[in-house]
């Protein structure tokens, strides 16, 4: 289990990037969702040993990785936003180099192990090609192979799908879902669909604070029955925004098609109730600062499983990951 307690990071200025993060993450896929500048990358860099916190503790399976960072390196896989590749090396040579740095030993040799990693991410055909000749999707897959080097206990994946086209994203989801067996995979993203497809549990972060710890089904249930959609003239949109929580508004043929959150049960004339999406719940939470209470929810700091039988959501539902058992 990964545990953080009272994690704070203050940059010169002062700028508080993290403000008391308490979180327990169990084996399986766990998401950290929030807007740009929320503190996600700072959090990930601290976990990866690339940044020292101002205060707080981080433990992996009971061991304090801030006190003994050397104990983390062999057990860590890290897929950062910006890949750390040597462009002149081949994909195979890049992996061999990383395996050597990690002190990995393999009966068949490191080249064979590197080949096995490339095969796992469908890059065997490009094993001898220089990394500078890889496409964006190929670089993403090589990054996964790097993260898997040494069979790590903890894999940190920071903003993995930014810039990927839909086909590459679906392929990436499938690859990432395979990593979650018997290890902790921590995914940070600002894309709601990423957590909807991959994460049985996730936390929502804003301005360095955790606003909620939830699951896709819990988040949707928190606003169920309170989302409405309708059209309004362009000139009436400011009045609607003043009176209701408008989460989305799209201009269509001279009128605004608006989506609103209205717990009063008395929506404006012409608005009809619509099914709730995870994006709806996320947008409402970002406005309210908390999820509306709809019964018992898991306490902050716990990252257990989603409710049994929770429906898959999003256009990539076929790639959804079952909670780790």
Regions found by a protein language model. Give the residues of each.
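ABC transporter nucleotide-binding domains
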Residues: 2-4, 9-206, 212
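Residues that cap or initiate secondary-structure elements
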Residues: 15, 29-31, 236-238, 264-266
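A generic structural signal for secondary-structure junctions
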Residues: 77, 94, 103, 224, ...
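Short loop/turn segments at beta->alpha junctions
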Residues: 90, 215, 274-277
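Short, well-ordered coil/turn elements that cap or connect secondary structure elements
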Residues: 107, 180, 243, 266-268
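A structural signal for well-ordered alpha-helical scaffolds and beta->alpha junctions
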Residues: 111, 233, 275-279
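ABC transporter nucleotide-binding domain
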Residues: 170-260
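C-terminal coupling/interaction segments
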Residues: 248, 252-325
